[in-house]
């Protein structure tokens, strides 16, 4: 990452923590009973299981196999599909929240078209839906 990208990411994390202070759980969790193909992801499964999450939203199908998640009653959801589902449930309210975010990103990167931004974020289906509105 470039220094600018790192700074943007750090600012985004700070903003997220300001907006959702309860989202980060420092609770110690014993990772030993949990297994995933990538040991670096086990802490995510452990926290989700211990806190009775219904789902883990991730693009990473390979390292979060549904068969393993089923053991804990957790579903893996693709972020693109999740945004489409949220759109079905909350339509204009969701779009009203996303428009300023997209405008900010586009002002920082005016050379990139909106659909390309959605594609780079691995959200192509939702991006097409958003672009049609």
Region spans (language model):
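Active-site neighborhoods of divalent-metal-dependent phosphate/nucleic-acid chemistry enzymes
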Residues: 20-55, 105-116, 120-133
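Catalytic cores of nucleotide-enabled group-transfer and carboxylate-activating enzymes in metabolic
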Residues: 9, 16, 43-44, 78
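Short alpha-helical scaffold segments that flank and stabilize functional sites
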Residues: 12-15, 51
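A short secondary-structure junction motif
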Residues: 1-9
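Short, mixed-charge aromatic SLiMs
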Residues: 16-20, 72-74
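Residues at structural and domain junctions
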Residues: 2, 30, 34, 84-87
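Acidic, PIN/NYN-like endoribonuclease modules and their adjacent C-terminal/linker elements
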Residues: 61-133
């Amino acid at each position: 990452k470039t220094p600018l990208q790192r700074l943007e990411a750090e600012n985004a994390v700070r903003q997220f923590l300001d907006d959702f202070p309860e989202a980060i759980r420092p609770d110690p969790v014993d990772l030993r009973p949990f297994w995933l193909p990538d040991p670096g992801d086990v802490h995510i499964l452990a926290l989700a299981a211990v806190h009775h999450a219904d789902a883990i939203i991730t693009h990473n199908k390979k390292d979060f196999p549904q068969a393993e998640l089923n053991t804990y009653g957790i579903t893996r959801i693709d972020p693109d599909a999740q945004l489409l589902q949220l759109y079905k449930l909350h339509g204009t309210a969701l779009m009203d929240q996303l428009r300023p975010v997209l405008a900010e990103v586009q002002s920082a990167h005016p050379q990139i078209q909106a659909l390309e931004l959605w594609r780079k974020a691995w959200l192509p289906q939702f991006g097409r839906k958003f672009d049609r509105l």
